[in-house]
């Protein structure tokens, strides 16, 4: 594909006409959830300004879902995604939302290191951590699964071969070179022998579906294609206590 074709193949916002309205709804629901009892906001895990965690606890000794937000490593923030905690919390699973420095202020190597630093911090409080994330957060999930504190992973609508990212509009801010792309592409790295679910929407862009299916095959993970969901609506299946992704999470925690 040439640059124009690649740009279109990975432009999730343009592919979903009401994506802006969906994100606005996420933000409203997240604001409401952040007022709940048991919320500890902006816990600092590292030296950078965005090295902060929002923690939603059930008050019980239970597994933790550590969720990494998306935005092609260069936009969005953890606060927008608090709404996804609703489903796990209903089942007694604690939830952490991880923030990190965005490109171009940070290179991808540094972003990966920050997220692993967040897991260092969380491992002091939790013995069972399922790492999860959406879009760029799905990529960071795969890159973090090797962390000793991670017991399992739930990667949602992620990117696992970053060569297309290097060649399309995403790289205008991400600034990947070929070497950095290769060492941060999970599909080219040794498989981590831990339980992993690779989820994607069957109404997503074909390239996103391809990346998920090929990565799941490569690492012998469970591929979970969700009918009727695009790149944005798929997160409703984690926000809902009865959602498919919530059920997948329960399976990863043995519940």
For each feature predicted by the language model, list its residue ranges:
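Short beta-strand element of the alpha/beta-hydrolase
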Residues: 62-71
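The feature captures the conserved acid-bearing segment of alpha/beta-hydrolase catalytic domains
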Residues: 152-161, 165-170, 176-217
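Catalytic nucleophile-loop/oxyanion-hole region of alpha/beta-hydrolase
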Residues: 76-85, 96-128
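C-terminal catalytic histidine-bearing segment of alpha/beta-hydrolase fold enzymes
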Residues: 209, 213-216, 220-255
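Primarily recognizes the serine-hydrolase "nucleophile elbow" in alpha/beta-hydrolase
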Residues: 117-173, 181
């Amino acid at each position: 594909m040439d640059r124009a074709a690649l740009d279109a193949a990975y432009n999730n916002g343009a592919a979903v006409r009401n994506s802006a309205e969906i994100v606005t709804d996420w933000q409203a629901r997240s604001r409401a959830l952040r007022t709940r009892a048991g919320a500890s906001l902006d816990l600092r895990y590292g030296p950078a300004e965005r090295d902060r965690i929002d923690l939603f606890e059930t008050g019980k000794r239970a597994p933790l879902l550590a969720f990494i937000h998306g935005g092609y490593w260069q936009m969005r923030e953890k606060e927008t995604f608090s709404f996804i905690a609703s489903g796990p919390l209903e089942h007694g699973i604690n939830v952490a939302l991880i923030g990190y420095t965005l490109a171009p202020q940070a290179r991808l190597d540094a972003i990966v290191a920050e997220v692993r630093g967040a897991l260092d911090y969380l491992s002091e409080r939790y013995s069972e951590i399922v790492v999860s994330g959406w879009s760029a957060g799905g990529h960071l999930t795969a890159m973090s699964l090797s962390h000793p504190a991670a017991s399992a992973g739930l990667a949602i609508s992620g990117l696992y071969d970053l060569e297309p990212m290097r060649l399309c509009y995403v790289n205008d801010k991400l600034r990947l070179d070929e070497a950095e792309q290769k060492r941060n592409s999970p599909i080219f790295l040794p498989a981590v022998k831990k339980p992993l679910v690779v989820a994607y929407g069957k109404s997503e862009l074909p390239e996103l579906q391809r990346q998920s299916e090929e990565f799941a095959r490569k690492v012998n993970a469970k591929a979970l294609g969700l009918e009727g969901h695009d790149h944005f609506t798929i997160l409703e299946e984690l926000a809902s206590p009865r959602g498919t992704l919530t059920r997948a999470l329960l399976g990863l925690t043995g519940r």
